[in-house]
Amino acid sequence: MPKLKTKSGAKKRFKVTGTGKVMSAHAGKRHGMIKRTKKQIRQLRGTRVLFKTDGDNIKQYFLPNA
């Protein structure tokens, strides 16, 4: 049986760390930033670690070879 392919959209959005955690960018930075404070905008920079259950689902269904 052949290996499962990784979903190409997930490949661009998520990164699996060496310890198996799943990292992703913060949501909510595409538009509507005028309503947010400078602190809120600043806190949305960079990446975040997903909750364990969400990360496990991402790895199982979208990143099977990670």
Swiss-Prot record:
One Pfam family it belongs to: Ribosomal_L35p
A GO term (biological process) for this protein?
Answer: translation
Known SUPFAM superfamilies for this protein? Answer: L35p-like
Query: What superkingdom does the record give?
Result: Bacteria
Report the coiled-coil segments.
Answer: none
| Assigned keywords, A-Z | Ribonucleoprotein, Ribosomal protein
Basic residues bias located where? 1-15, 27-40
Q: Which GO terms describe its molecular function?
A: structural constituent of ribosome
Task: Please name the InterPro entries in this protein's record.
Answer: Ribosomal_bL35, Ribosomal_bL35-like, Ribosomal_bL35_CS, Ribosomal_bL35_sf
Q: Which residues does the annotated region (Disordered) include?
A: 1-40
A cellular component term, taken from the record's GO annotations: cytosolic large ribosomal subunit
Q: Which family does it belong to?
A: Belongs to the bacterial ribosomal protein bL35 family.
- From the Swiss-Prot or TrEMBL record, give the protein name: Large ribosomal subunit protein bL35
Species of origin reads Rhodopseudomonas palustris (strain BisA53)
Q: Name the gene that codes for it.
A: rpmI
